[in-house]
Amino acid sequence: MAQPSTKVYDLIRSRIMSGTYAPGQHLVETEISQELNVSRSPVRMALKRLTQESLVTTESNRGSFVAQWTRSDINEVFDLRQMLESRAASLAAQSATPEEIARLQSLVDEMAELAQRRAEGYRDDLHHNNQAFHLLIVSAARSPRLFQFVRTLTDTSLTLGTYFYYSDADIDRSVHFHQDLANAIASRNPSAAEALMAAHLCLAHTAFETSRFGNDEQSA
């Protein structure tokens, strides 16, 4: 049975990802503990864990707040991901093992099923699937430093919450890109894999930014 702090963590994290808790929102321990009918201890532990994951920020004498991302932050993270992961996809097409290629296809199949069924909590499941897919490609590139750099970027709250801002059309397009990427790597086509990853992350960047900010230029 899951510990109270784990259940509280899962709930707060889900609310942050879905936007129920908005960026910059004050997360008051007493209010959350009363709502969830738990003591303040598991709430405090959950907020500490979320702070370590950069989903929450803690300010002295003020408390905990949902982490905020500016338009500039979004541009920086996606630009770096596009540069690094495009290179990783090219390398993966040259060095991925048959087992890794099979696993990539398995993740694509799972993603397609999740997107089709759209069961409760499917966006969170899509996030985990997506992260596993991208990190597997980077791992298959056989570059430990590249993997560490990308892992740092994909662990940000900005990247973790991407699927909660996607439209159904965005999700369907993402599934198709993942299939095309898996095919390019399986066929040992580095240039195609690199171009597909660049296009995939460029469109993901646009979809996320548009959904997150719309045309509000004041968020930069």
Where are these regions (language model features)?
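Short linear motifs at protein or domain termini
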Residues: 1-94, 210-220
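Conserved amphipathic alpha-helical segments that form helical-bundle/coiled-coil interaction surfaces
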Residues: 77, 87-89, 94, 98-162, ...
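Electropositive phosphate-/nucleotide-binding environments in soluble metabolic enzymes
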Residues: 2, 6, 175, 191
